[in-house]
Amino acid sequence: MNINFARQGFAWRSLAMPAVLVLTMLSSHVLAACPTDAAIDAYVADFAAKRISKGFGNDISAVDAECAKKKLSIKLRKVLGQPVGYKAGFTNVALQQRFNVDGPRWGYMYDRDMIDILAVVPAEFGARPLYEADFIVVAKDAGLADAKTPLEALGHIEFLVPFIELPDLMLEGTFSGNAMVATNVAFRGGVLGMEIPVVKSQAFLDALANMTVVMTDENSGKELGRAKGSALMDNPINAAMWLAQDLKKNGIALKRGDLLSLGGYVPPQPTKTGMRVQVKYIGLPGDPAVSVEFN
């Protein structure tokens, strides 16, 4: 991070500032700091061991959370494999309010624990394992970041993919949104459904906003949650556009095949042994679905 200290209006008498002010400024500087490499390594060790972690502090600032995430993105490769895309978090207003963040954030996704279609995974796949109804778009090219309208954006998307994210909220106690961002927005893995071809039409765009995402316990038939497609920034394609644009602002150009996870439709829920969860996207062609079983 480059910080430019303005020198306009500087007066030599400012060197004689009160000691209390000096101490206050120093104190603030100490508190506001990107986590050290040692702290990053400690978190990665906790992550690899699937144990609860103290993370990087609940009071971490948004700037320092981004710094931690960037450092962590390199170290997580030895546990999670190669980068495969990016995940948006807090695209749902309810989750923004729950974690007291002022807008969406994003993290990195990796390939090692991304599983296709009908998946059986350990219920204890992490320190605090959860499942979440999500949705993925597959980028066609970097032009997604420059699209001016959702309809134009569809032309830069290869496929849509039903997705159950398997996040790991492994921080101890309660935690802030910034603390979660610092840990790469809790990404660990997920289950991918069948690819849905994109139709560049207003009708298809409307179907994405109007679809109903339903999460069900397949063993009992109990509904676990539902939301309209519009729960993610009025249309999931808006979430894809936001993510592509924010990545570009951070010097990241999308490439063909990058996965973009768009955020949770309903709050994440804890896994249970023997449970089988289905997420269905009612209103899209064929009402596509994706399932996962926990053993």
Describe the residue ranges of each PLM region.
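N-terminal secretory signal peptides that target proteins for export/translocation
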Residues: M1-W12
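Hydrophobic helical h-region of N-terminal Sec-dependent signal peptides
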Residues: M17-M25
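N-terminal signal peptide c-region/cleavage motif recognized by signal peptidases
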Residues: S27-H29
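Catalytic-core "active-site belt" of small-molecule-metabolizing enzymes
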Residues: A33-D234, P288-S291, N295
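Short, exposed beta-strand-loop hairpins at the edges of beta-sheets
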Residues: N184, Q278-G283
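C-terminal soluble interaction/assembly domains
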Residues: N250-L254, L260-S261
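Short, charged beta-turn/beta-strand-edge "cap" motif at the junction between a beta-strand
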Residues: V266-Q269, G283-G286
